[in-house]
């Protein structure tokens, strides 16, 4: 029996809706309209066959004859798919001529992922009091300097907004190999050191004085000398700022080298040892290290001095060696567990260049509606990408879909954009289809009050590709509620009559034992919001305000829905509407013939627990 009156008058609804945020255009539809999907065996098989065919054709191009490639796709549970391409020109190789899951690559800036994890774990454990602490609190020997180190925070370094130089002590070009080459060197840091005499002459740069050369770190001049923290800090004390701190995103490998020094100062052990003890060993990344393995196990080009180059203090930004298998293991960990119990480390921290790019710790985040071709459904790709000499590595994490991709290449690289598009876009489309089908199978349908409740109330939920789960009909005590809400919302917004009431999961789940002890119920909380069906891209229609808790009724949130699921089977049994103080049972034919008597007994207790919250 309902404890509170279900008779909402137009006047009451008008008062409630007057407290809501402004109208939301369709382009402001909430993201992730579904729980994190799972991928039963063979569910993505057709998609992977298509991706394999595309990738095979792409790397058959003559320009990739000396290129080795490894691509893996993983969920939080297991590796789902892999693609390996060995260089057809075997004479170009000085290492393994067979590429597989255990082939070692230099993974360049993917090293930053481990550094960021380590810093966030130290913060989580209380060894770093605040991510907004100035870095010179931990590394006072950065001063004296013209850089305002007392304004550069740990957070700035993690997000690449410290405003400091990008690279120091990088000499990626070996003059012995390219004395007459054109400008084809990837990853150079200093033209004076990295370019041949001919290349420098073509740029018509002025001569460099001996006084300037004398203050440069020895490892900047001689690649065979590993750079150390003392040399880096000395160089930074004489460096100039690129921007003021926390103003502009500009990549800084030096920033992550400083984070490596921070880890050493806090832990009392070398950076490499700390990463091995806290990340590599616990995750059993058995082929991951900061030292090159024997060439026979690696993807190594002939005359490639980058393979064995000891980058020293730059290990936290570019020094790691790893395999496709180990990186997939690391990515599974990132999907399953955050290094911080406080922060959502997938969330952006600052703007980046362009309208679709953001940055995080240490992510380059790409957010676009292109994969799904639905204007109001953006996909978010959390990436780390980098090049070191002939090596390019990319990781792409899609937490909404419980998927991650790794790409490792060496040789004639080309740009990774094309292959990333050919892998991730079909993958996202297939994963989105699986996720929405799961919502359709598990949540869509009509939920009704039981005869014993003596009230004519129900809710009908449907699924669409652009809005996910939405309320199609809401009946309270015999009255249709949605038309009233639509009219009042339209009146408040000043125009527009086509309102969509969309539900999204909050991931605030709990479990309890059924009353008779014969089943465990999962209480899965969702919230719904209202979206005005206006096209995106027109004027200010893309300006979005968000609130999933805009109104309450007698202290209960009107927009809260709690689905009750049988923990063993995963079947949705009922939904509790908190504001209406009622639990509605899923129609028997839509509940997969779950034993109705047992379900109702469990649901009665579940509803009482929800109302008691």
Swiss-Prot record:
Residues carrying sugar: 61, 89, 286, 422, 456, 477, 581
Keywords (A to Z) from UniProt: Glycoprotein, Hydrolase, Signal
Pathway(s) of this molecule: Secondary metabolite biosynthesis
Pfam families xref list: Beta-lactamase
Keyword Signal: yes
Documented EC number(s): 3.5.-.-
Gene3D superfamilies reported for this sequence: DD-peptidase/beta-lactamase superfamily
GO molecular function, one term: hydrolase activity
Signal sequence region: 1-25
Main function: Probable hydrolase; part of the gene cluster that mediates the biosynthesis of squalestatin S1 (SQS1, also known as zaragozic acid A), a heavily oxidized fungal polyketide that offers potent cholesterol lowering activity by targeting squalene synthase (SS). SQS1 is composed of a 2,8-dioxobicyclic[3.2.1]octane-3,4,5-tricarboxyclic acid core that is connected to two lipophilic polyketide arms.
PANTHER family named in the record: BETA-LACTAMASE-LIKE 1-RELATED (PTHR22935:SF95), PENICILLIN-BINDING PROTEIN (PTHR22935)
Family statement drawn from the similarity comment of this UniProt entry: Belongs to the beta-lactamase family.
Identification of the protein by name: Probable hydrolase clz13
Provenance organism: Cochliobolus lunatus (Filamentous fungus)
